[in-house]
Amino acid sequence: TTRILNIYDQTTGEKYDKQSIDEYIRLNEDLSGGTFSYDNAPGVDNIMHGTDVSYIAAGSLGVAYEADIIAVKMGYSINNQFPRTTSLMDAIDYIIRKAIEYRKPVAVNISYGCNYGAHNGNTLLESFIDDISKSYRCVICVGSGNEADKAIHFGGIINTGQVQTAYLSVGEYQSAIDIQIWKNYWDTIDVMLINPRGEQIGIITEGRINRYETYNTEIITLLGEPSPYNIYQEIYINLIPKTDYILSGIWQIVLMAGSIRAGEYNIWLPSSQALGYATAFNNPTADGTITIPATARNCIAVGAYNAYTNSYAAFSGRGFDN
């Protein structure tokens, strides 16, 4: 019989228990003459990423090879491309509630990450993980991501009066780009974009939402406002093509420092999976590439290790050096 106690398929809303899974396996083997087919299996993993990870963690040759399993197939966003953080929160809640029902401790594995946030533990998802990890006998393990060698992060320290530039290569056939700039609220930093044709667009860093237009591209900016739990401000920049694609070439993100008290800033692109193969920073920073929610305070962040070279994998997401 299966060691899977439950499957929750968020894409359909269906939930399966051990009895129904065992029954499916029995009927399927009877009809196929012993050859098992996964085509219509409950909560079938079409991507196979979750299956591969669970095999390492709890497969017959895995680490916890006798452990029971509660599996969640995550739902997707409206455009059906990437999971939503709310889906992940629902999945964690489901697993822990089931563990409470079975009166068993539980290790929750999350092999998911994104770049949206200040990477300081203060997003809703990170706070949720911190809180729910204290609610029961559980440990939450989160992969640190695969972004360290993908050139999706640029950051540093800027002092009063300095100008620093991030060079962003935009490949052909790039449909849209989201750029996040995070800085301390009390630092005054002006931002200017320069497109590959040399046109300069000064970004207004006051107000809320602003719109600009440059060659074949509409630019929408959203400025974050103070909150009780976050000392960082987001300057969100969305590049949207007027036709099919953004103007390819080197875009410059120019930071011009006014009054500076801290000076630390970070710029993130979306996950490399959401970008074209040639879209990346020319002068990236590998530190700070750990993905959210591995940045939560009460989780175990897990990197990737290369056993052949006895070192961490080049792609393994990294935290900050401070």
Task: Describe the function of each predicted region.
Residues 113-115, 145-149, 306-308:
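Catalytic metal-binding/acid-base residues of hydrolase active sites
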Residues 58-59, 93-100, 130, 134:
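Sec-exported extracytoplasmic/periplasmic mature domains
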Residues 80-81, 119-122, 151-156, 265-267:
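Short acidic, glycine/serine/threonine-rich loops at helix termini
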